[in-house]
A protein has these predicted regions:
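Alpha/propeptide regions of enzymes that mature by internal proteolysis
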Residues: 1-366
Length: 366
């Protein structure tokens, strides 16, 4: 179930055909999911991977930028993006304690895949949120096998949402969270560009939850919360990946990443000290950036670029905010009930219950 299937149309923009990050040409998404008992412990975790282009990211770099709304989180590879403005690897999302293992596995995959003697370093982007309530996070069950599976199955088309990949054990606004996606396509007179969002949602308090601007969370307090006896509501994080085919430069990608904060705020998130809210945006509009291989001596001294004029960038900002907002609602509607190891229920938010809560707040529908 997704927001639009319930008649919840967020914002003014129009989604792409998949209403997902994969509406940006060349972008692919893959998941590897662990949902089983291992050595007597419940394991619910995995890896979600975004390939920014149809070819190898190192050979076809993208301009990129990042933004941190609240820094109680971790991510590898972002310092070089801040410095050089280039995304040269796939982007992986996993749980907090598996960042290093996923990074190492991506490095090994890169070396084996390219096999170029000129390739001498790789700094993959790996992002995380904490799934320790529903997953044996200390067991560090994610490794090279899961990374390989996510790479192998990365594809365009509809994106699987909810309890899948890195989002398998996540909690959002005290409901079952996980992976979500949405997109917006600008009209031709605004460039026809697409902005897509993919999120891993593990954040937010229920009482703060808003959908289409209406405070539905206050109408959902009778549904059990996994934090009623232990833990702090809102503890957790949200990771956002934004993709666009607009010809943005790195500083413009950073500006786009900042607008993810608006989508998070519209749904009632973004105010928790314990949340790691890390956002990355990349742009595929410049197709011929030189390969990111500093051992080569035959690269040109300069490369012609295209840039979207800032006078025309505001519709992209609006599209990014709307896509993130809708992706969060899609996460909530894609959930399934789960229980913690000690028996606490992490409930899914059912579509009919969300609609009832919306109507109670005076939501008119559209």
């Amino acid at each position: 179930m997704r927001a639009r299937q319930l008649g919840i149309t967020l914002g003014l923009g129009t989604p792409g055909p998949f209403n997902a990050i994969t509406d940006v040409p060349g972008v692919r998404v893959g998941h590897s999911t662990l949902n089983q008992r291992i050595d007597g412990r419940q394991v619910r975790t995995g890896v979600t991977l975004v390939q920014p282009r149809a070819g190898a990211a190192r050979l076809q770099p993208c301009f990129a930028g990042c933004h941190v709304l609240n820094g109680n989180g971790d991510a590898t590879g972002l310092e070089w993006i801040r410095e050089a403005g280039l995304l040269t690897t796939p982007i992986a999302i996993t749980n907090t304690h598996s960042v290093g293992a996923v990074r190492d596995a991506l490095i090994a995959e890169e070396r084996a895949e390219l096999g170029d003697s000129g390739l001498y370093w790789c700094m993959p982007v790996v992002m995380e949120t904490f799934d320790g309530l529903l997953n044996d996070i200390w067991g560090q069950h994610v490794g090279a096998r899961q990374v390989g599976e996510a790479l192998a199955c990365a594809e365009s088309g509809p994106v699987r949402e909810g309890s899948v990949g890195g989002g398998t054990g996540m909690i959002c606004h005290e409901f079952k969270g996980g992976i979500g996606s949405a997109s917006r396509r600008l009209p031709a007179e605004q460039g026809g560009w697409t902005v897509g969002a993919l999120i891993q949602a593990n954040h937010g308090q229920r009482r703060e939850l808003r959908v289409d601007g209406y405070p539905v969370g206050r109408r959902l307090g009778d549904i059990p919360s996994p934090f009623s006896e232990e833990g702090t509501p809102g503890m957790g994080s949200i990771v956002v990946i934004l993709a666009t085919d607009a010809p943005l430069l790195p500083h413009q990608c950073q500006r786009l990443a900042q607008r993810a904060s608006i989508g998070v705020a519209r749904t009632g998130g973004g105010t928790e000290d314990s949340s790691g809210d890390v956002f990355l945006a990349f742009a595929t509009g410049n197709q011929d950036l030189p390969p990111a291989d500093y051992a080569r001596k035959d690269l040109p001294q300069s490369t012609p670029l295209r840039m979207l004029n800032n006078d025309h960038i505001s519709p992209l900002f609006a599209a990014a905010a709307e896509a993130v907002e809708e992706a969060i609602v899609n996460v909530l509607l894609a959930g399934e009930d789960m229980r913690t190891e000690d028996g606490r229920l992490v409930p899914a938010l059912k579509g009919e219950r969300l609609l009832a809560a919306l109507r109670e707040t005076g939501w008119p529908g559209r």
